[in-house]
Amino acid sequence: MPAPLTLDGFRADLAEFLYQQPDEVDLEENPLYAGLDSLRIVTLIERWRETGADVSFIELAECTSFDQWWQLLSARQGGAGHVTA
C-alpha cells in the first residue's frame, strides 16, 4: 500500500510543477493564478490518487487556494470520501 500524502509531499509536488522550492509554495495562492494548467492538475491528481487520495478534477477546480486543495486531499486519504455503489 502506498504511503499517504503528507503536507510536505503535497508542497513538494506543487513546487515541482511551479518551478519553486517547497517552502516557497504559498498555500493561500489560487492554483490557476499560480500557473497550473489543466494538464498539470490532472497529472497531480493521478499522482495523488496513487497515494490513496480520491479527488476529481472538478472538485479541485472548485477550490480557490492550494490550502483548500490540501484540506480536500487530506480528508480523502485512503478513499475516505469514495462512495461505492
From Swiss-Prot:
Key words of the record: Fatty acid metabolism, Lipid metabolism, Phosphopantetheine, Phosphoprotein
Functional pathway: Lipid metabolism; fatty acid metabolism
Chain positions found as O-(pantetheine 4'-phosphoryl)serine: 38
Domain Carrier: 1-77
GO biological process: fatty acid metabolic process
Gene3D superfamilies, sorted: ACP-like
Disulfide bonds: none
Cofactor(s) essential for the protein: pantetheine 4'-phosphate
Role, per record: Acyl-carrier protein (ACP) involved in the biosynthesis of a unique class of isonitrile lipopeptides (INLPs). Is the dedicated ACP for the loading of activated acyl groups catalyzed by ScoC.
Family: Belongs to the acyl carrier protein (ACP) family.
The protein's name in its UniProt record: Acyl carrier protein ScoB
Organism: Streptomyces coeruleorubidus
